[in-house]
């Protein structure tokens, strides 16, 4: 009696594999043993669907392709959703840090492009953000930069989510005021 293949853990359907992956860094590492050194490779990979979901993962193995495969699997399991403004930039400026890695992410006007250093650029390209200005202030270690970028992205929130948390309207959060009848004439005279 043949069993039907399961659809992953929890019975969830597998998503269409429209996920792109970017290799951030690969590093040869050594384990010192009695007979000398054992070499392995450590890989850091960022994955995303370019629609607001992104994740990162690290993998280590004796061969480069196996390390990249492990890192990619871990990255797919650690994906987060980031709210984007108009599908191209962040809603607000945000700061993040991990260890000595500190990053500042700023939303940008249309046509600005991705102004960011190497590891951060891979995160934004995988995320689908087209306009952002980012600056790394601390450690230049790729692992710390990526983790600091994710710490910042996790702090991002949309005006709609802020409004629902506070029990207000989105217009109250954004500071847009509707003119009250009778005040239009007063503003013209002032």
Swiss-Prot record:
Pfam families: Ribosomal_S5, Ribosomal_S5_C. GO terms for molecular function: rRNA binding; structural constituent of ribosome. It comes from the Bacteria. Residues 169-179 have a biased composition (Basic and acidic residues). Residues 161-190 are annotated as: Disordered. GO terms for cellular component: small ribosomal subunit. Residues 19-82 form the S5 DRBM domain. SUPFAM superfamilies: dsRNA-binding domain-like, Ribosomal protein S5 domain 2-like. GO terms for biological process: translation. Keywords: Ribonucleoprotein, Ribosomal protein, RNA-binding, rRNA-binding. InterPro entries: Ribosomal_Su5_D2-typ_SF, Ribosomal_uS5, Ribosomal_uS5_bac-type, Ribosomal_uS5_C, Ribosomal_uS5_N, Ribosomal_uS5_N_CS, Ribsml_uS5_D2-typ_fold_subgr. The N-terminal domain interacts with the head of the 30S subunit; the C-terminal domain interacts with the body and contacts protein S4. The interaction surface between S4 and S5 is involved in control of translational fidelity. Belongs to the universal ribosomal protein uS5 family. Part of the 30S ribosomal subunit. Contacts proteins S4 and S8. With S4 and S12 plays an important role in translational accuracy. This is Small ribosomal subunit protein uS5. The lineage of its organism: Bacteria, Pseudomonadati, Pseudomonadota, Alphaproteobacteria, Acetobacterales.
